[in-house]
Structures are given as structure tokens and as C-alpha cells.
Swiss-Prot record:
Gene: SYNPO2L
CDD domains to which the protein is assigned, alphabetical: PDZ_SYNPO2-like
UniProt protein name: Synaptopodin 2-like protein
Species lineage: Eukaryota, Metazoa, Chordata, Craniata, Vertebrata
Bias (Low complexity): 216-226, 530-545, 572-595
Annotated region described as Disordered, given as residue ranges: 91-226, 317-352, 364-677, 697-802, 922-950
Family: Belongs to the synaptopodin family.
Sequence ranges of Pro residues compositional bias: 109-123, 183-192, 436-450, 596-607, 704-730, 781-796, 929-938
Organism name: Homo sapiens
Gene3D superfamilies (UniProt xref): 2.30.42.10
Keyword Cytoplasm: yes
Length: 977
């Protein structure tokens, strides 16, 4: 080892100094610097590891214990003067001459002594001092990296044993240098003054090339001697960073300092989500492996979506242009062009996978004759969707009829053909945008017959239909007729006016549109025109074909309930390829619309609306946006049609939305809808299907005005998506309304039979509910007997699992006292006959006790006393207790109002009740909803006397009106019979 030298190191700035000592008198070892924290004051001042302390602030360390030395250091205040002894031959590791060390303040990075001064002059006190104002001792900031050296030095800390001695043969710098990537570990003992200078100078540039790292750098890896708290790095820029090594990233700082900058979870999650989205988007759009399954699937799916969305003529005046792929608005068409021209090369960038493109191209060949470049046109029709052809047709029409519209939407280009885009833009898309203003626009595109191969596209329209659900199966055959793409602007009424009777047509179109796409588009057109059967000038564009399937009746369009067969649009519009069906043609041929065949079923009026929506709003946004939207909007290519697919009956909907409102005077009077509502959202859903059934019956356009039945009749097609208006007589017999929304239209109690899927579901539900109705003691007539045999029997009466199964409440728990127990439940109707249980003694209305759970369809909700069973003797209940309490362990039963004599309520042993299962009201349960005579039987639950009150289903409303509480306290352990 080289000669030892004494160096005076002055640290300023106050603790923590950033070094550690080991040894001491107690260990009979000299006090030695075991570790220097990088970027600490000690490191900046030039203190080095393995330096032996000779004196601390002038106090000799010869006999100092470690603790004494520490206390001296701690007491040093803002300046610590250490006299240390270090090996002179350490070279770069050696501390630079005091002068050099003084230079340490980064400003003098290059000032250090010439390389010749590897061995610093023996301590010159004060020579090593870090600037007093420096935060450097803990300033671990990026600013530290400002020094030139910084750039050179990697930030990676070097890890060395704190006391690792330099091998005698090798210069210490070598040992340390191995750590620093930039500098080779020179074996030069201490010679390169550059190393030293580097040590002294913040920028080690001088010797950066191969010079050993500065002493500071060497020290950096080591932690300070001081206790942890002193080691906390200061976050903040250091005006004169000595070297990169002395600086660290904020992340490192935060870790070291355990600084957790509070970043709200929300911010974190947002950042993560953004990152993920970007990653996913980049992986999907510029996939490293374009042929990976995920990418291919994604592209295929995107193509499929485009097939059905592009048709939307990008109506949104270019807004729609937003690409799912993130391609610029008009890029859709451009993309398609590229895809077609470059299909294979574009695999990554283009929407189409090369394999998929290949297939599409092959298919496109058949359609090539369509008049679009076989590469482009064919693919577009196949890949992009008939939209391209449609656009072509529309473009032709638009050229004549919708040029003004053209400017509205150059975005039409989106649809696959860049070439066509201008005309296309002129054509449908503008129309789409304009359509609302001009409801009459006839199907713009004379269906350009797809190539005979076009048949394939037809299915696509079907798909549209499927998503739009505008058509009833019946329509399918006629759908070609509906082909006419009539844009009925969302302002359908105006459209109707202009069209004359056309508006009614939409319902017909539904039928005609039928989901069935014309298998042969080419031939389909002619047939479609005839189907239109309306003078509507069939756009002779031949294939009215399946395009019509795309039509989505615009619910907004008031169609005559009769489904006035005003031709929604000329079949020709439909003829426009199946794609055409997608595009909105309304604006293009306003006159045509009147032409549209009158056939109610055939009139596809809504399609234009849907088309319109698609095209107008058709702002296709990035894939991610689409995904984001998907959560709210289930449909991939939002059929913007307003027709309610199975939208709940408006009445039901209003009921559901108004659950919180007080029930209208009487449950029965409120009408079936109200009652259904009382049943809870779930029940409403069931009712809804019934409504849906009626909807199907009703022509899509059928306004509420038409009698519910009328709407059913007029539309032959009875689109599945009848206007949400499908009337449901609210007042119709309770049973009628409740049992069967459809029946309500009929207005006959019989409808309770429930027709259609909705009815079945409802009946099922009701039969199941009957089991749970607790009217009287579970008697022989117990729940097992359903109201009316439901078309599809549901679970056997034995089925008893309650929807709310949880641990039973504590025995002492009285639900009535629970803060959550609705007041309504506490106050039961006074009218309770005192007759035997068999008598319609109203047990707590299931709904009452369940009012706070309106969403659950519980048997109690259906208390229909169609056929009140003979009051069975109350099994365990007091014989004449008027009050029947359902014991739902988890729902608080509402005690019957004392209005009825407070006959002691008999609580059955807990075993008697299933969790959350009310004791059956056999009377109510037995009454089948379907029974046409709901009025005769007053629901026991509602009326004081079972027959006196019309069937009333308690509404899930909270009301404190009933104050009578039963004398008995309900105990969860006991079942109430």
C-alpha cells in the first residue's frame, strides 16, 4: 500500500453527514470510515471509505470509543472537521489534494489539479469541504446530473463492501472502477490525476474516458455512517452536482427516502389504465407479431364491426370518421384502399390481417364486377361491408340528389372506398347527417346489386337486423322490400308529414325487412321492388336485397298504429346492396320515400333512421373508445335506432323509475303496471317481456295512441322492436296487467295467459312467487298450487331457496326496530279481516316488508288472491290472528297494523320458515294470475276483507302511514304463521 497521508476534510451543512464509522477504542481498532453515502456531504467533501479518523473537530480519536466519536460528530453543529489518514497510493480512490477537494463544489469540476496530483497533498485542513449551502449531502436529485460528468456516469450505484480493502496489488480505483461502467478500472494506483481531479471535480469529464471514477463516485455506493434518518436523501436540485453517481432518479430517492409522494389511488389507476390502453392499442395496431392469434382475432373482429359500421357512410360529417383503429376520420376508406391495394403489406397497419385480407380479397374477386376495383370494391363489399357498394350506389344517387349532402359528409369515405368517398360522402353520409331534417330521403342508393356474390353481404344486413332487432322474424321474407333505405330523420314526424303516410310504413318495413336478408342480392332487388308493392319507385338498383335488413325502424317515427304501410322507402333503396340497407338513403331520394311501398310490413322506415344514426353519429372512434362505449352501449355498431328493442313498456318503465313515489291511490287502481312495479324491478322485467311480446305485435312505428291491440294487428311483421310505446292498459285488470303485459293490450283478463316469451317468463315467475306468498298459515293449499298454470311451469312448489340466504339475524334482533326497516313495513294496513288465516288476513304484505328491496321479486310480491284457498287452519298460528307475518329471516317483517284486532300473532318455530321465505299465503298463492277475474277477488293483502279490495300489490314505497304495530314483537327465531 502506498504511503499514508493525512487529509483534512471539512464537511459543512450539518448532519446528516453521510458516512459511517466502525472500530473504536472498545474494539481496539482505529476509527475508520466504513461507508460513505453517495451524494452525502461526506462524499462531496472528499471523505473516503477506509479513511482512518485521526481527529474530529480537533479532538484526537486515538482513544475514542465509537460512541464518543459519534457524539462528537453529532455535536459538531454545521461544520465537521475531520482529520483523516488515507493511503496515498489509492490513486483515484485517494482523496484529491485538499485544493482539489475544495474544488468539489461542482463549479470547479475541471479545475482540479493536473493529473499529476494523484496523491493529494497531505491533509490541508479545510481542503475538503462541501459548500455549506449545499444540499448535496442528501440532495439526490436529477439536477445533480447536470454536471458534465453526470452525463458520463451511469446512475447505477456501485455496491462495494463498505470496508472492502483494495487488493494490495491492485489500485483501489481498480476495485471500485470495475463498478463504474463508463470508466475502466484502471490499475493505475493513484496516478491519473484525472481520477483525482474527477474526484474533486464534479464533472469527471477530464478522465472520463478511462479514468477511475472520482473518489466521490467511488464513495457513492456506500451508505453514510450515520443512522438511517440521516441517510434520508434530500429531494431537491443540487446546484452543483459533483457527478452523476452522486445523483439519483427521483424514484430512487423516493425509495431511499421512503418518500411516498401521495398519489391518489385514482390518479394511479388512471395512469395505469392509460398505460394499459396505450400498450394494448399499440400491440393491436402495430403488433410485434401481426400474425399472433390475438392480433388476428382483433383485426377480424374490427373488420366485422366495420363491415356493419362502415355502412354508416360516416355520416357524422366526418366525425364518424374517427376510426376504431385510431385511423383518421376518413382513413376508413383510405384504409380499405390500402388494405385492398396493399392488403398483405398492411397487415400491421391495416385493419385487415393479411390472412383475413387474403380471404376477403378472394371473396372480393366475386364482387369485383360490382364496379369497384375488384381489389378495393370487392374487398370493401366483403370486408368493409356492402357499405362500399352501397356508397357507390348512393354516390350515384347522391350525385344527383344529395350533392348538398355530399359536403356534409366527405367522411362517407370512411366506408371502404377512398375513391368513392367523395360521391359517397355526397351520398348517404350527408344524407345520414341531413336525414333528420329531411325524413323523406328515399333510399339513396339504388341498390347497386352486389355481385351475385353479394348474397353474402345480405347476411350481414341480417346481422344488422340482429343487432338492431328492428325486424320480427315475419319481416324477413319481405325485408328486401324494406330495403328501401328511407332515412327517417329522428324527427320522424316531419318525415311522416312530408312522406304523407310513409311514416307508418316503418312498422311494415319492419315486417318486410324481416331479418331475412335477400339471399341473392342481385335478384333480390327486383323482388324487393315488388315486395315494396308500393309505387315506391323501386330504386331499380337491383338488389334491394338484404340491405333492407339493415333498416332499423326509427322508433321516433310515429307510424300509424295500423302500421300504415306507407312505403317507408322505395324498395329500390333496399335494393341498394345489403350495405345499402345500412346507409341512410332518406335524404337522397326524398320523393322516393313516398314511393316506398305502402305495405305496412314491408315499410322499413326505421332502417333509415338507424342508418342515419349509424352514419350520422357514425363517428367511429378509436378502438379503445369503442370499447369504452361498449360498456354503456352494448351494440357494436350502435344501431342508433330509437326503436326500443325490448325496451320496457313505457308504463312499466315509468313505474320502475318512479318506485320511490307514493303509490297512486290504490294498487289496483294504479293499474297492472303499477302493480308490476310494486313487484319490484325484477317483476317489471318479467312484465317487460310481456310488453316486449306486445311490442313485437305492435308495429315498430305504432304510436302509443293506437290501441295496444291495434298496433299488434297492423304490423304483419310485428317487429320485435315495436315502439316502446306498445300500449299496456295500465288499468286493465290487475291480473291482466301483472300477469301479462301483452294481455293488457288485449284488455281481456284472459291475456293473463301471457303470450310470448315474456308471458311465459312472467307466468313462471308468478307460479314460483305463489309458493312464496304468505297469506295464511302454510296450509294444505300452500304455495304448491300456482296461480294459473304458467305456460312454462317453474320450479316445483318444493323449491324453496330464497333469494336472500344469509346467516339468520341475532335472536334479539327485531327488524322492525332496525333503522333500515321501512316505515311502510312497520305500519301495516289496518284492514285485516280477523277471519281465520284462511281468511284473507293480511299477513304482512310481502311487499311491505320487502319495500326496501323493491328489486327482488319475492313471492310476497305476487299476492294474487285469484282463488283464495280455503282458509286452512292456521297450522301453528293463533286461529284467528288476522295478522300474518311473513317471517323472512333477513327481511324485517312488517307487523300487520293493529287495526285488525291484535290477535296474538303466533310465531312458528324458526324451523317453520325457510330463510327469507315468507310463510306461504296459500290463498294468495293459489290464485292464478292468469285468472281473468282479478277484480272479483280482492287481494287479501290489500283489502281489509280478502274480496273487498281489488288485487293490490304493495308498492315498494316507504310510507309511514300505517302506524298500527302488532302487539307481538317479531322474533327472528320464530316463523309466523
Amino acid at each position: 500500500m502506498g504511503a499514508e497521508e493525512e487529509v483534512l476534510v471539512t464537511l459543512s451543512g450539518g448532519a446528516p453527514w453521510g458516512f459511517r464509522l466502525h472500530g473504536g477504542a472498545e474494539q481496539r481498532k482505529p476509527l475508520q470510515v466504513s461507508k460513505i453515502r453517495r451524494r452525502s456531504q461526506a462524499g462531496r467533501a472528499g471523505l473516503r471509505e477506509r479513511d482512518q479518523l485521526l481527529a474530529i473537530n480537533g479532538v484526537s480519536c486515538t482513544n475514542l470509543s465509537h460512541a464518543s466519536a459519534m457524539s462528537l460528530i453529532d455535536a459538531s453543529g454545521n461544520q465537521l472537521v475531520l482529520t483523516v489518514q488515507r493511503l496515498a497510493d489509492e490513486g483515484p480512490v485517494q482523496s484529491p489534494s485538499p485544493h482539489e477537494l475544495q474544488v468539489l463544489s461542482p463549479l470547479s469540476p475541471l479545475s482540479p489539479e493536473p493529473p499529476g496530483a494523484p496523491v493529494p497533498q497531505p491533509l490541508q485542513p479545510g481542503s475538503l469541504r462541501s459548500p455549506p449551502d449545499s444540499e448535496a449531502y442528501y440532495g439526490e436529485t436529477d439536477s445533480d446530473a447536470d454536471g458534465p460528468a453526470t452525463q458520463e456516469k451511469p446512475r447505477r450505484p456501485r455496491r462495494r463492501g463498505p470496508t472492502r480493502p483494495t487488493p494490495p496489488g491492485a489500485p483501489p480505483d481498480e476495485v471500485y472502477l470495475s463498478d463504474s461502467p463508463a470508466e475502466p478500472a484502471p490499475t493505475i494506483p493513484g496516478p491519473p490525476s484525472q481520477g483525482d481531479s474527477r474526484v474533486s471535480s464534479p464533472s469527471w469529464e477530464d478522465g472520463a474516458a478511462l479514468q477511475p471514477p472520482p473518489a466521490e463516485a467511488l464513495l457513492l455506493p456506500h451508505g453514510p455512517l450515520r443512522p438511517g434518518p440521516h441517510l434520508i436523501p434530500m429531494v431537491g436540485p443540487v446546484p452543483h452536482p459533483v457527478a452523476e453517481d452522486l445523483t439519483t432518479t427521483y424514484t430512487q430517492k423516493a425509495k431511499q427516502a421512503k418518500l411516498q409522494r401521495a398519489e391518489s389511488l385514482q390518479e394511479k389507476s388512471i395512469k395505469e389504465a392509460k398505460t394499459k390502453c396505450r400498450t394494448i392499442a399499440s400491440l393491436l395496431t402495430a403488433a410485434p407479431n401481426p400474425h399472433s392469434k390475438g392480433v388476428l382475432m382483433f383485426k377480424k373482429r374490427r373488420q366485422r364491426a366495420k363491415k356493419y359500421t362502415l355502412v354508416s357512410f360516416g355520416a357524422a360529417a366526418g366525425t364518424g370518421a374517427e376510426e376504431e383503429d385510431g385511423v383518421p376520420p376518413t382513413s376508413e376508406s383510405e384504409l380499405d384502399e390500402e388494405a385492398f391495394s396493399d392488403a398483405r403489406s398492411l397487415t400491421n397497419q391495416s385493419d385487415w390481417d393479411s390472412p383475413y385480407l387474403d380471404m376477403e380479397l378472394a371473396r372480393a374477386g366475386s364482387r369485383a364486377s360490382e364496379g369497384q376495383g375488384s381489389g378495393l370494391g370487392g374487398q370493401l363489399s366483403e370486408v368493409s361491408g356492402r357499405g362500399v357498394q352501397l356508397f357507390e350506389q348512393q354516390r350515384q344517387r347522391a350525385d344527383s340528389s344529395t350533392q348538398e349532402l355530399a359536403r356534409v359528409e366527405p367522411a362517407a369515405m370512411l366506408n371502404g372506398e377512398g375513391l368513392q368517398s367523395p360521391p359517397r360522402a355526397q351520398s348517404a353520409p350527408p344524407e345520414a347527417a341531413v336525414l333528420p331534417p329531411s325524413p323523406l330521403p328515399a333510399p339513396v342508393a339504388s341498390p347497386r346489386p352486389f355481385q351475385p356474390g353479394g348474397g353474402a353481404p345480405t347476411p350481414a344486413p341480417s346481422i344488422f337486423n340482429r343487432s338492431a332487432r328492428p325486424f320480427t322474424p315475419g319481416l324477413q321474407g319481405q325485408r328486401p322490400t324494406t330495403t328501401s333505405v328511407i332515412f327517417r330523420p329522428l324527427a320522424p314526424k316531419r318525415a311522416n308529414d312530408s312522406l304523407g303516410g310513409l311514416s307508418p310504413a316503418p312498422p311494415p318495413f319492419l315486417s318486410s325487412q324481416g331479418p331475412t336478408p335477400l339471399p341473392s342480392f342481385t335478384s333480390g332487388v327486383p323482388s324487393h321492388a315488388p315486395v315494396s308493392g308500393s309505387p315506391s319507385t323501386p330504386r331499380s338498383s337491383g338488389p334491394v336485397t338484404a340491405t333492407s335488413s339493415l333498416y332499423i325502424p326509427a322508433p321516433s317515427r310515429p307510424v300509424t298504429p295500423g302500421g300504415a304501410p306507407e312505403p317507408p322507402a322505395p324498395p329500390s333503396a333496399a335494393a341498394m346492396t345489403s350495405t345499402a340497407s345500412i346507409f341512410l338513403s332518406a335524404p337522397l331520394r326524398p320523393s322516393a320515400r313516398p314511393e316506398a311501398p305502402a305495405p305496412g310490413p314491408g315499410a322499413p322506415e326505421p332502417p333509415s333512421a338507424r342508418e342515419q344514426r349509424i352514419s350520422v353519429p357514425a363517428a367511429r372512434t378509436g378502438i379503445l373508445q369503442e370499447a369504452r362505449r361498449r360498456g354503456t352501449r352494448k351494440q357494436m355498431f350502435r344501431p342508433g335506432k330509437e326503436e326500443t328493442k325490448n325496451s320496457p313498456n313505457p308504463e312499466l318503465l315509468s313505474l320502475v323509475q318512479n318506485l320511490d313515489e307514493k303509490p297512486r291511490a290504490g294498487g289496483a287502481e294504479s293499474g297492472p303496471e303499477e302493480d308490476a312495479l310494486s313487484l319490484g324491478a325484477e317483476a317489471c322485467n318479467f312484465m317487460q317481456p310481456v310488453g316486449a311480446r306486445s311490442y313485437k305485435t305492435l308495429p315498430h312505428v305504432t304510436p302509443k295512441t293506437p290501441p295496444p291491440m291495434a298496433p299488434k294487428t297492423p304490423p304483419p311483421m310485428t317487429p320485435k322492436t315495436p315502439p316502446p310505446v306498445a300500449p299496456k292498459p295500465p288499468s286493465r285488470g290487475l291480473l291482466d296487467g301483472l300477469v301479462n303485459g301483452a294481455a293488457s293490450s288485449a284488455g281481456i283478463p284472459e291475456p293473463p295467459r301471457l303470450q310470448g316469451r315474456g308471458g311465459e317468463l312472467f307466468a313462471k315467475r308468478q307460479s314460483r312467487a305463489d309458493r312464496y306468498v304468505v297469506e295464511g298459515t302454510p296450509g294444505p293449499g300452500l304455495g304448491p298450487r300456482p296461480r294459473s298454470p304458467s305456460p312454462t311451469p317453474s320450479l316445483p312448489p318444493s323449491w324453496k331457496y330464497s333469494p336472500n340466504i344469509r346467516a339468520p339475524p341475532p335472536i334479539a334482533y327485531n327488524p322492525l326496530l332496525s333503522p333500515f326497516f321501512p316505515q311502510a313495513a312497520r305500519t301495516l294496513p289496518k284492514a285485516q279481516s280477523q277471519g281465520p288465516r284462511a281468511t284473507p288476513k293480511q299477513g304482512i304484505k310481502a311487499l311491505d316488508f320487502m319495500r326496501h328491496q323493491p328489486y327482488q321479486l319475492k313471492t310476497a310480491m305476487f299476492c294474487f288472491d285469484e282463488v283464495p284457498p280455503t282458509p286452512g287452519p292456521i297450522a301453528s298460528g293463533s286461529p284467528k290472528t288476522a295478522r300474518v307475518q311473513e317471517i323472512r329471516r333477513f327481511s324485517t317483517p312488517a307487523p300487520q297494523p293493529t287495526a285488525e284486532p291484535l290477535a296474538p300473532t303466533v310465531l312458528a318455530p324458526r324451523a317453520a320458515t325457510t330463510l327469507d321465505e315468507p310463510i306461504w299465503r296459500t290463498e294468495l298463492a293459489s290464485a292464478p294470475v292468469p285468472s281473468p277475474a282479478p277484480p272479483p277477488e280482492a287481494p287479501r293483502g290489500l283489502g281489509a276483507s280478502p274480496s273487498s279490495c281489488g288485487f293490490q300489490v304493495a308498492r315498494p314505497r316507504f310510507s309511514a302511514t300505517r302506524t298500527g304495530l302488532q302487539a307481538h314483537v317479531w322474533r327472528p327465531g320464530a316463523g309466523h304463521q
